[in-house]
């Protein structure tokens, strides 16, 4: 028979060797569904022929070099697939149909939907079938019924069986007899078989109801998922067949009611089941030492199996492997092709599966072949032996070998959903560049021998041994009869089926599985969860309470390299991006341990920069940690500097009680500042502490004393008005409270600490923010003013370019006429009649008798003085009141004087850049001037002329008369109304028009 074996055909590969044992396979499988009737066969053949003629090349996946007609080839392929389909069980058929439906287009899917609806209607026509189907459908979605079923499954525990076996072991009649071909069955064994049969019946019922689970029924789905861990554990203890649990996994992985999160959890338990199957296969190899069967019998035992699996990595190879899912544990043989994306296997490429011998499951006709192995040896304290080393099969089972299949159905379902465990499950220290096995050469050779022997257990066609590596060399056959170095460990407690296992019997061998070197920031996590999911949380085995063996293992570990110059750059480059530097962040350094007071040891070591020695404390109790000495640390491999530092810090831990007691007393007596107390609390908050409720003397309760000091400090800050409420102290105290909330010692008081932190945060917000330094009053140029110092006259720029001492105004307008001051206001001359006039009366114009150095410069020198106009000059006041008026004006000007006067000098005449450079201004104080116009010269001033003095004397009588009329016996300043700004501007403009003539 010829047919295509392309990679796209999912059904046609790996079938050639099954013609000899097809009858035995079909009888062993016992398919529950009936074969198609003759009518259906005729319809199928007609449809096949029609499809063949309708399509010129119906076999798109066939080899184009074939010479047979396409219609005959397609018919043969359909016949082959149909024959295979009849040999499969319901679960295998469902998985295959599910895989094929995903490859169809939408029209074909709709056609199949209509066909399925029609078939369901026809099949439900009979009353008996309808009634049974309805009952199963109702029970499959009834949470109450499912819960009762789960409780019944959990009720059958092996403890009752163990008691029955122990009670019946003393009876002579119950002793088994192996002298003949038959064995006397004891009452305990009958109970055992009844127990196993009941659990198996429940699993069969679950297997029938699980496909009928409706999407959206979360309550029923949760019960199905709850059954999985219990069933996997029973499989590891060889209570239920492995095939039933695998079929349940297959349905769950492809069921539309299962979400992605549910599949992740199922993937974890699937890996546990995979590890058990591989350990069982390893146990089958080890039975050669205890049972010493003939190698030919072991190789020939596969002839009783249900079929063989092709090692081709195409989708068809895995599909053919699914045909023997109910009874085979057949590994891949011969070739080493790569796996496809559609049907990738779940087993790692470095691990081998062994063929399951038919009828070898606890003597009940099917199941795992590792009956003589202690089932609890495979899972020691939750840590499987396959997870104690790297992915290169650290137990030495098969260092070299072709990839194998755990089971075709589970592999197919897992690969279709993209949860193939090959990538994640192979995670080891190889990502860190440290995958170096410390096996002896003899051990490595033994592992190679085991792999060769395991590859010979699964034949290709009807039990024929594989041509390549099927028969081991003679020397290897002798080595197979010798126990491997770990065989005594695995088989040491075979007779103690359910007894307690010596957890530390593996320490010497586990130490041999360590790597030679590791980065200083890399920790070897041996937890099953962290090994499978590549978690970064440091998980500690709770049951490993004894730390002596752990320290012995730590002592044998070579000194790890740090990230320094001795660590070569190439090793860091080749280590990949996963350097695990994030493992030692404060949020990740946590211990899940039962040792009270040791959960915070990671943060404490991180604060000391000694977190590379975190493995030293993972199984240590609080009391053992306090008894560590420097000599002990050096004896277990800690460096001298680190051991000295760690010993000093441990000695300080013993002094915490005295320190807290002293701080408490000093705070109550007022001899210690709050900042000092907060600093002491900062040094203690990260140290490991026992909970407050832990038994022990009160003086050793560090957590209680710590809370007392915190209470005193916070009460002092809240109630004492004289306490220095520093913002920095409050911030540090809030940090201490935050660390205390997450501390193991204060878990029961977290709410109180949160309330206290909230009160301190409110106090911190209500505090006055810090101001700048305030100078005392009367000091400095600003007289204690805390505001920004204002711009004064001393800082104003002078026109030194043109030789002028006048300050440059900050002009916002180009018109200089608006820059006026109090000097532009007309006020009387301060001449006293009883005193002779000074030598220079023009300096006494503004009433400042102190000379030119006391005259303030409010007016720009570019603004001319028009007070010398004889027509606009007001008459002088009476001499008796002139001096009083001058004093008042001086006081007024001093109040408005923001710019102290500078000493005046008489610079040479120079031009200014105002009024189109037509005004020549002389330096010094402004005086009454007479404007004399000369052509070509602009405006000139005649200072000190006799004409100016004469005009001034002639105007004095007129000014006196006008002043007497306005004053009426009162001073002119008191009676004269104040002029507005607009009036002053208009007056200045009028004076400007009178005295200036522009060309």
UniProtKB/Swiss-Prot annotation:
Composition skew (Low complexity), residue ranges: 321-338
Keyword RNA-binding: yes
GO CC terms, sorted: cytoplasm; P-body
UniProt-annotated stretches for the region Disordered: 1-45, 50-69, 321-370, 773-892
Source organism superkingdom: Eukaryota
UniProt keyword terms in alphabetical order: Cytoplasm, Developmental protein, Phosphoprotein, Repressor, RNA-binding, Translation regulation
Stored Pfam families: PHAT, SAM_1
Domain (SAM) ranges: 600-654
Gene Ontology biological-process entries: negative regulation of translation; nuclear-transcribed mRNA poly(A) tail shortening; regulation of DNA-templated transcription
Modification sites for Phosphoserine: 564, 575, 972
SUPFAM superfamilies: ARM repeat, SAM/Pointed domain
Subcellular location: Cytoplasm
Chain intervals for the UniProt region annotation (Interaction with cup): 583-763
Stretches assigned to coiled coil: none
Ranges of compositional bias, category Polar residues: 1-37, 801-822, 854-864
Subunit annotation: Interacts with oskar (osk). Binds to the 3'-UTR of nos. Interacts with cup, which in turn recruits eIF4-E, leading to an indirect interaction between smg and eIF4-E that prevents mRNA translation.
UniProt family annotation: Belongs to the SMAUG family.
Record comment regarding domains: The SAM domain mediates the association with the 3'-UTR of specific mRNAs.
Role: Translation regulator that binds to the 3'-UTR of specific mRNAs such as nanos (nos) and prevent their translation. Prevents translation of unlocalized nos in the bulk cytoplasm via the recruitment of cup.
Protein name as annotated: Protein Smaug
Native organism: Drosophila yakuba
Gene (UniProt): smg
